[in-house]
A protein has these predicted regions:
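Single conserved hydrophobic/aromatic residue that forms the stacking wall/gate
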Residues: 258, 265-267
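Bacterial N-terminal signal peptides that target proteins for export
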Residues: 1-8
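Bacterial N-terminal signal peptides
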Residues: 9-17
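Accessory carbohydrate-recognition regions in carbohydrate-active enzymes
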Residues: 24-255, 259-260
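Sec/Tat signal peptide C-region and signal peptidase I cleavage site
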Residues: 19-23
Length: 267
């Protein structure tokens, strides 16, 4: 079967997948999966030392088979080793903290008919690999190899698709915490920018702030669009919570920062 690759760059600067060094270094002995279960709150995502950006597999929502779900209990990490339902990569997530924060801007690669419900587009996975600054996983439902790496202020994702139609989704309505409020604007055929509200560290509703991002694609997509879904609510008289997002075909790239959008694009 002929394979095709798309490169997704979540970047303030270009990110590079490094070649393996011939001599072993201390970094080669690191196991990023340490602390990813038994409430260790760590994650195996790609991040550099003191880096602002991290790219983390998100597997804590969408499946009744998950051992842990972010909305079923106090939960502070986008990843748990024993969960096996992947709904995308989260960006800017924290590792090793005891309260939920960040872990949003979820990007997901799919194939076949388009669906924007994470319960439907989520998938089981296998062949996880992680090393300092790198993570990869194979998505069973789609036959897609997903890879991620990071620089201090950027990240890059590379997807190897089977032949056929592929999609990359940017879900702004879901994340580790459930703040409502997001905006996305098309800048050109290959670039969008937007804002997402984050915060409520330790479920403190007053601690909310915006994060700004720019998303660029390496190829002009054949089609693109937006979706908005209402989150199900229980025990409230009325509440409006938009589930914003954008879908595009083929390849995308994003910038992430706590600066304004035009400053993000400059980075």
């Amino acid at each position: 079967m002929r394979l095709r690759r798309t490169l997704f760059t979540l970047a303030l600067a270009a990110a590079v997948f490094g070649a393996a060094a011939s001599a072993q270094t201390p970094a080669d002995r690191v196991d990023p999966f340490i602390g990813t279960t038994n409430f260790g709150t760590a994650n195996p995502g790609a991040v550099t030392p003191h880096g602002m950006m991290s790219v983390v597999p998100f597997n804590v929502m969408g499946s009744e088979e998950n051992v842990y779900d972010k909305d079923a209990r106090w939960w502070s990490t986008p990843y748990e080793y024993h969960n096996k339902f992947f709904t995308g990569f989260a960006h800017g997530a924290l590792s090793g903290v005891g309260c939920p924060e960040l872990g949003a801007l979820l990007t997901m690669a799919t194939t076949g008919p388009l669906t924007v419900d994470y319960r439907e587009y989520g998938t089981s996975y296998r062949d996880e690999k992680a090393s300092p600054g790198y993570y990869s996983v194979f998505l069973d439902k789609y036959g897609v190899l997903a890879e991620a790496t990071a620089t201090a202020r950027s990240s890059a994702e590379r997807y190897t698709f089977p032949e056929g139609t592929g999609h990359i989704l940017l879900n702004l309505g879901e994340g580790l915490t459930n703040e409502s409020g997001a905006m996305v604007r098309r800048v050109s055929a290959t670039e969008i920018e937007g804002t997402k509200l984050l915060g409520t560290f330790c479920y403190n509703a007053q601690k909310v702030f915006p994060v700004y991002f720019v998303l660029r694609v390496s190829k002009t997509p054949s089609a693109g669009g937006y979706w908005k879904k209402q989150r199900k609510m229980t025990g409230v008289e009325a509440e409006w919570t938009p589930d914003n997002g954008r879908y595009k075909l083929y390849t995308e790239s994003v910038s992430y920062t706590h600066l304004r959008a035009h400053e993000t694009a400059a980075n």
